[in-house]
Curated annotation (Swiss-Prot):
GO terms for cellular component: cytoplasm; Holliday junction resolvase complex. InterPro entries: AAA+_ATPase (IPR003593), AAA_lid_4 (IPR041445), DNA_helicase_Holl-junc_RuvB (IPR004605), P-loop_NTPase (IPR027417), RuvB-like_N (IPR008824), RuvB_C (IPR008823), WH-like_DNA-bd_sf (IPR036388), WH_DNA-bd_sf (IPR036390). DNA binds at residues 322, 327. The keyword DNA repair applies. It is an enzyme of class 3 (hydrolase). It comes from Desulfosudis oleivorans (strain DSM 6200 / JCM 39069 / Hxd3). One of its GO terms (molecular function) is ATP binding. It comes from the Bacteria. Keywords: ATP-binding, Cytoplasm, DNA damage, DNA recombination, DNA repair, DNA-binding, Hydrolase, Nucleotide-binding. Residues 267-343 are annotated as: Head domain (RuvB-H). Pfam families: AAA_lid_4, RuvB_C, RuvB_N. NCBIfam families: PRK00080.1, ruvB. GO terms for biological process: DNA recombination; DNA repair. This is Holliday junction branch migration complex subunit RuvB.
């Protein structure tokens, strides 16, 4: 496989992974991640759904139903998979769709799962179709079918699996096949975070990092973090570094402005790529409509990156319209870029 598979256990004395590296287990990867529902901020309906489902499953002494999370990247899907494993007292194995190139890769993982263990597949929409087909009986009947020989000599042998829980995550739920999508019992969409929830995350993370930050500064970071916890934590770390070296260790709004200017993040949270995306539509294509392939070719960026990373926030902020004839920059986008609205 091209990508690593990580295995975690709810037993604190167990190793993080059989394939761990310093990068995998570094402080930055895990130190800010909530360990339980009490510390998890946001996605309230999803959390409540999972609390109820987990409590019911534990009362019946059954594994949890299969779970599918979908939404933009960085909103806490992987973190919730860790919390589910901790709440259920089971082990968590993490992989991704592109890493499961062959059916044998998937089968090898499934056969090592114990009852109730969780298999988290990120980017599950990128599973090869031949690999995906092995999941159907595995999810529904907890079995995998092996076919031996071909033609009139073909024989099928069914191998029983322990009852596991599949947690899938995707940024492109529309690309999932109906047979796979319909096999998930719990289906939840992740939304961008409010500024209030992001400010709570900043306060919590700052406390864990030993930083002092006031309410004005937490809201300033929240405002410029694209509604995304992963980004707000990353920006907080950059601000921490900046004030440590350039600002006497004191976090102020002006220090945040200076630190984020170095990162190319403007007052609305747009990055250089976001602004280039909007400028391309306005300057090269008269404000649109224009197809995503044309935008990608002009920017020399992959269309998947634009669709998954750039567009969701621009749509949520009202800076972009996505129509049947293509993408259009809104009046708000013109104003933000300081360009005269063409109407």
């Amino acid at each position: 496989m091209k990508e690593k598979i990580l295995t975690f256990s709810s037993d604190p004395s167990s190793p993080v992974t059989r394939h761990e590296t310093e990068e995998d287990t570094g402080d930055d990867l895990f130190s800010l991640r909530p360990c339980d529902f009490e510390d998890y901020v946001g996605q309230d309906r999803t959390v409540e759904t999972l609390r109820i489902a987990i409590a019911a499953a534990k009362q019946r002494s059954e594994p949890l139903e299969h779970v599918l999370f979908h939404g933009p990247p960085g909103l806490g899907k992987t973190t919730l998979a860790h919390i589910i494993a901790a709440e259920m007292g089971t082990s968590l194995t993490i992989t991704s769709g592109p890493a499961l190139e062959k059916g044998g890769d998937l089968i090898g993982m499934l056969t090592h799962l114990k009852r109730g263990d969780i298999l988290f597949v990120d980017e599950i929409h990128r599973l090869p179709r031949t690999t995906e087909e092995f999941l159907y009986p595995a999810m529904e009947d907890f079995a995998v079918d092996f076919v031996f020989d071909k033609g009139i000599h073909a024989r099928c042998h069914r191998y029983r699996l322990n009852q596991f829980v599949l947690v899938g995550a995707t940024t492109r739920v529309g690309l999932l096949s109906a047979p796979l999508r319909d096999r998930f019992g719990i289906f939840r969409k992740f939304d961008f975070y409010s500024r209030q929830d992001l400010a709570r995350i900043v306060s919590r993370s700052a406390a864990l990092m030993g930083l002092t930050i006031d309410e004005t500064c937490t809201m300033e970071l929240a405002r410029r973090s694209r509604g995304t916890p992963r980004i707000v934590n990353r920006l907080l770390k950059r601000v921490r570094d900046y004030v440590q070296v350039r600002h006497g260790g004191v976090i102020t709004v002006s220090a945040i402005d200076d630190a984020l200017a170095l990162e190319g993040v403007d007052e609305k949270g747009l990055t250089g790529l976001d602004r280039s995306y909007l400028e391309t539509i306005i300057q090269y294509y008269g404000g649109g409509p224009v197809g995503i392939e044309a935008i990608g070719a002009t920017l020399q960026e992959e269309t998947d990156t634009l669709v998954d990373v750039v567009e969701p926030f621009l749509l949520a902020e009202g800076l972009l319209q996505r129509t049947s004839s293509g993408r259009k920059a809104t009046e708000a986008a013109y104003r933000h870029l300081g360009v005269q609205w063409r109407g």
